[in-house]
Curated annotation (Swiss-Prot):
Its main location: nucleus. Induction: Induced in the shoot apical meristem (SAM) during vernalization. Zn(2+) 2 binds at C105, C108, H112, C124. A motif (Bipartite nuclear localization signal) lies at residues 121-137. Disruption phenotype: Spl15 mutant plants fail to flower after vernalization. One of its GO terms (molecular function) is zinc ion binding. Residues 12-27 have a biased composition (Low complexity). This is Squamosa promoter-binding protein-like 15. Transmembrane segments: none annotated.
Length: 355
């Protein structure tokens, strides 16, 4: 009996499982672990997915945001589709957007109120101001140039030359200032600016003397002596120079100083023309040996001035002989020849000074 009961239970269980399998297969066919449904249900699910995709496309379509336009910008340029404005309304002076009269700014790429625009301008006032500031930067080249000249000219050249430079730069009142500064109103000034190069005890040196113009014949002031690379005291040099300078020297009233030597003094004749005023005023002084025999000669003496008789005096009052005088004149003539205009040759030692 129990076996029969157990078999009956097994049959009922198998029948229940078969009924569940049949109910599960009623919706579709089962092959292995996959269940395939009918075409009607499958087509319904596919159409619902396509419907959702189409609605998403419709919502992403770019259109012009101007009221009354709503133009489709799908096939337009990316600029217009990105900013949602058509080509016509992007250049219009007045459109209605969100119920307000506005205008499209081509630099901001946005719509602004009409009060933010200037007349006949396609960009807003704020963008135009920034654009003008970038374009119209102040050029500081002229100001830097003028400040540099104003800073360096007085320190390097002095008052007269700085006035000349200012006259060149365009200052109309600078030329009168330069002319007034060039005039010397003080007493007679005869400053021999002596420059000794490689000077030492017992060695040869080259000294150049550049006397200045004399405006009055009141006195002398030789306080402008400059010595380079020398170990001697400038005050001692000044005293020696004053002792060696003779008193009976011809001083012309035209403003030219005579050529003064250590032992020999040659009175320089007055110049022929005013054009050679500064050229005749320069002299060259050569010192050779330990005895420091100074020889003065002018680098710009012409043949007519050399042929004129020159008065040679010695500090003790005696006069040089004719032979020595002719010898000095020959040296001057050789110096003024074309082949010897660029150098000077002395007999004891050879000096080649390029002028």
């Amino acid at each position: 009996m129990e076996l029969l009961k157990g078999s009956g239970l097994n049959q009922t269980e198998s029948g229940g499982s078969s009924s569940t399998e049949s109910s599960s297969l009623s919706g579709g066919l089962r092959f292995g672990q996959k269940i395939y449904f009918e075409d009607g249900s499958g087509s319904g699910s596919g159409s619902s997915k396509n419907r959702v995709h189409n609605t998403g496309r419709k919502s992403l379509t770019a259109r012009c945001q101007v009221e009354g336009c709503r133009m489709d910008l799908t096939n337009a340029k990316s600029y217009y589709s990105r900013h949602k404005v058509c080509c016509i309304h992007s250049k219009s002076s007045k459109v209605i957007v969100s119920g307000l009269p506005q205008r499209f700014c081509q630099q901001c790429s946005r719509f602004h109120l009409l009060s933010e625009f200037d007349l006949e301008k396609r960009s807003c006032r704020r963008r135009l101001a920034c654009h003008n500031e970038r374009r119209r930067k102040p050029q500081a080249t002229t100001s830097l140039l003028s400040s540099r000249y104003a800073r360096t000219a007085p320190s390097l050249y002095g008052n007269a030359n700085s006035a000349m430079i200012r006259s060149v730069l365009g200052d109309p009142t600078a030329w009168a200032t330069a002319r007034s500064a060039m005039r010397w109103s003080g007493p007679e000034r005869e400053s021999h600016q002596v420059m000794n190069v490689f000077s030492s005890h017992g060695s040869s040196s080259f000294t150049t003397t550049c006397p200045e113009m004399m405006m009055n014949n009141n006195g002398t002031d030789s306080s402008c002596a400059l010595s380079l690379l020398s170990n001697t005291n400038p005050n001692q040099q000044l005293q020696q120079h004053q002792l060696q300078t003779p008193t009976n020297v011809w001083r012309p009233s035209s403003g030219f100083n005579p050529v003064i030597a250590d032992r020999v003094t040659m009175a320089q004749p007055p110049p022929v023309s005013i054009h050679n005023q500064y050229l005749n005023n320069q002299t060259w002084e050569f010192t050779t040996g330990e005895k420091s025999n100074l020889q003065y000669m002018s680098p710009v003496l012409g043949p007519s001035q050399i042929s004129q008789p020159a008065d040679f005096q010695i500090s003790n009052g005696s006069t040089m002989g004719g032979f020595e005088l002719s010898h000095h004149q020959q040296v001057l003539r050789q110096y003024m020849e074309p082949e010897n205009t660029r150098a000077y040759d002395s007999s004891p030692q050879h000096f080649n000074w390029s002028l």
